[in-house]
Curated annotation (Swiss-Prot):
Domain of life: Eukaryota
Main location: cytoplasm
InterPro entries according to UniProt: bHLH_dom (IPR011598), DNA-bd_prot-inh (IPR026052), HLH_DNA-bd_sf (IPR036638)
Protein name in the entry: DNA-binding protein inhibitor ID-2-A
Signal peptide: none
Organism in which the protein naturally occurs: Xenopus laevis
Record keyword Cytoplasm present: yes
Pfam families, per the entry: HLH (PF00010)
């Protein structure tokens, strides 16, 4: 029977884990930390793009999303009130229906959004909570 030293077996298993870790991290879907960093990058990009978000102040993800929603609504109002667009609305459409109904009603009440976020976060498992700050 051949005996192995504990140092050698630890080294052997760490190499195996290391090589498996490299193989596993090839796709972003398999690496939750990569997904988290990608989401944080997206929030940073949104913060840069929306002019009403203060750039020199730390804002929460919920605040960023609220600013984005408000900005989109402002852009929609601006487009709807633009003279060239208004004149297009008075032309009959080929489809017959002149107004578009939203797929779902927009919720602009931040207190309700905060409550929904609290309910959503309670559904996370302990493992997923450790991934999200």
């Amino acid at each position: 029977m051949k005996a192995f030293s504990p140092v050698r077996s630890v080294r052997k298993s760490s190499l195996t884990e290391h090589s498996l870790g490299i193989a596993r991290s090839k796709t972003p879907v398999d690496d939750p930390m990569s997904l988290l960093y990608n989401m944080n990058d997206c929030y940073s990009k949104l913060k840069e793009l929306v002019p009403s978000i203060p750039q020199n102040k730390k804002v929460s993800k919920m605040e960023i999303l609220q600013h984005v929603i408000d900005y989109i609504l402002d852009l929609q109002l601006t487009l709807d009130s633009h003279p060239s667009i208004v004149s297009l609305h008075h032309l009959p459409r080929v489809g017959g229906n002149t107004s578009r109904t939203p797929l779902t009603p927009l919720n602009t009440d931040i207190s309700i959004l905060s409550l929904q976020a609290a309910e959503f976060s309670s559904e996370f498992t302990d493992e997923s909570k450790s991934l999200c700050p």
